[in-house]
């Protein structure tokens, strides 16, 4: 497996320790996935923000990673564990939650991420974009693969961050056209008049999947009978619901 020149340079430590660590992760992921090449990525979206889900390990990891480098492509950040204005209402039973939460956010910011704190990076306007992304948020993955020309695998927070710091990802999975083939056919014979209808459709599609089906990249429905015009909100409702069942597109 031949490395792109810049990725090899990062792996050798020529661009600092932060990017060297990220490059090592990208290369290790490529070996694990059996990838034969790497692709240049245009945008990344990183999950793993809440101190409750990431714990002290996330804080230590980010503290260890920060300091010698920043992201090389536009990168947005997923939602945090709370709104600081709603702390009392949320009644979060976690010691020093707010302080630790903002420590994590500031660590990401120091790496150059846009602290958008949103799980819908497509709200920034990607309908006309094309190329490759590295997104670690299931509803965002389903939306962009379904409604735009921007292609992404369903990444982890760590793989999306490693790609953000290097600009590269292993070429595998949904990056390859042969893996983006519908494996379910859905015929619509009813009117979809409300956003709830679109959400129910996505939910219903997901519930048809059986554990014994051989669909390594998840269910990918080909939906027939949809109206010629679908609003942005309806698209969002459909793919967000279907993503709950592992639909990547």
Task: Report the location of each language-model feature.
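Non-transmembrane, aqueous-exposed alpha-helical and coiled segments at domain scale
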Residues: 1-249
């Amino acid at each position: 497996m031949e490395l792109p020149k810049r990725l090899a340079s990062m792996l050798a430590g020529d661009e600092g320790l932060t990017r060297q660590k990220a490059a090592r992760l990208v290369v290790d992921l490529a070996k694990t996935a059996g990838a034969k090449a790497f692709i240049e990525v245009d945008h990344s979206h990183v999950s793993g923000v809440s101190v409750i889900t990431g714990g002290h390990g996330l804080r230590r990891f980010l503290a260890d990673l920060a300091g010698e480098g920043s992201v090389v492509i536009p990168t947005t950040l997923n939602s945090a564990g709370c709104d600081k204005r709603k702390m009392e209402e949320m009644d979060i039973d976690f010691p020093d939650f707010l302080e630790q939460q903002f420590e994590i956010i500031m660590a990401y910011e120091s790496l150059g991420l846009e602290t958008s704190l949103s799980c819908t990076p497509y709200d920034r306007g990607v309908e006309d974009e094309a190329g490759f992304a590295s997104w670690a948020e299931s509803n965002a993955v389903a939306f962009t693969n379904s409604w735009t020309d921007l292609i992404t695998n369903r990444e982890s927070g760590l793989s999306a961050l490693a790609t953000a710091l290097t600009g590269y990802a292993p070429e595998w999975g949904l990056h390859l056209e042969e893996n983006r083939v519908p494996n379910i056919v859905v015929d619509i014979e009813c009117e979809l008049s409300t956003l709830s209808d679109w959400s129910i459709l996505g939910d219903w599609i997901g519930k048809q999947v059986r554990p014994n089906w051989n669909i390594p990249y998840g269910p990918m429905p080909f939906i027939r009978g949809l109206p010629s015009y679908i609003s942005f909100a309806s698209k969002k409702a459909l793919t967000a619901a279907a993503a709950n069942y592992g639909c990547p597109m």
